Amino acid sequence: MLNEFKAFIARGNVMDLAVGVIIGGAFGGIVKSLVDDLIMPIVGAIFGGFDFSNYFLPLSSAVNAPTLAAARAQGAVFAYGSFLTVLINFLILAWIIFLMVKGVNYLRMQVERQEEAAPEELPPPPADVQLLTEIRDLLARRPAV
């Protein structure tokens, strides 16, 4: 059973998936920082200098705090600004993954086209067939009697 597990792990698809998950996790942090630290401040400046991550609607009359963190401590809130930030984060990540998959598919198609265009070399015939072919050719060149 251990050997079967080793064979399963050693297959390319499982290793590719593991690498993809690790890189995706790291890349997700990069995209989150891009959205939180670069894009959302620009969007906030365009719309009057507001920080979208602090936009919320109180769902209880007991909530009267000015920031999202304090409002959450007081009660239930509808944090639509935080959702907008996460949504933009997701859209950027999905777009980048789409472009990466599109690039990989393009490269894969190029390789397939090259393989189709290259003529396949036939393996040499067996030795007995080669010998019979040579005998036939010699007999064909021999003058008729």
Swiss-Prot record:
What are this entry's molecular-function GO terms?
Answer: mechanosensitive monoatomic ion channel activity
Recorded hits in InterPro entries, A to Z, give: Mechanosensitive_channel_CS, MS_channel, MSC/AndL, MscL_channel
TM helices/strands, residue ranges: 14-34, 38-58, 81-101
Q: Where in the cell is it found?
A: Cell inner membrane
Keyword vocabulary terms for this entry: Cell inner membrane, Cell membrane, Ion channel, Ion transport, Membrane, Transmembrane, Transmembrane helix, Transport
Q: Which domain of life is it from?
A: Bacteria
Q: Which GO terms describe its cellular component?
A: plasma membrane
> Keyword Ribonucleoprotein on this protein?
no
| Statement: the UniProt record of this protein carries the keyword Ion transport | yes
Q: Which residues form the signal peptide?
A: none
User: Which coarse location class applies to the principal site listed for this UniProt protein?
Assistant: membrane
The way it spans or sits in the membrane comes to: Multi-pass membrane protein
An example Pfam family from this entry, by short name, is MscL
The record's NCBIfam families line, in alphabetical order, gives: mscL (TIGR00220), PRK00567.1-4 (NF001843), PRK13952.1 (NF010557)
| Quaternary structure and partners | Homopentamer.
| Function comment | Channel that opens in response to stretch forces in the membrane lipid bilayer. May participate in the regulation of osmotic pressure changes within the cell.
Belongs to which family? Belongs to the MscL family.
Q: HAMAP family annotated for this entry?
A: MscL
Protein name per Swiss-Prot or TrEMBL: Large-conductance mechanosensitive channel
Its lineage opens with: Bacteria, Pseudomonadati, Pseudomonadota, Alphaproteobacteria, Hyphomicrobiales
